[in-house]
């Protein structure tokens, strides 16, 4: 849907379930992992901006253990590198910057700054695997 494919890069956290990175591999894009912050399980938000290149199309923050990411910092990182963004299709052109696609499988029902998960990122994915908060 977002037109990500070979030659593109997608930033994912190093601390996540394999499915987050696997979807990037399945479309032929390059997986770019960003490490966690010291003494934390959260992505090191300062490193997100450092990882963005002209090939970056998506940043995939992962909400963990019912706690949503600091989306203010994620969007700040994306905005700080807006000039590097090279859209490849109409959806990407409409955003004019790297797209934020949240993996909120572990945050179903969580809130961040009075906004429900699913309302904060540009797009949000949920999983219904047996070990997730909402299983099928």
What is the meaning of each model-derived region?
Residues 91-135:
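Conserved active-site segment immediately N-terminal to the catalytic lysine
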Residues 3-104, 111:
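PLP-dependent aminotransferase-like
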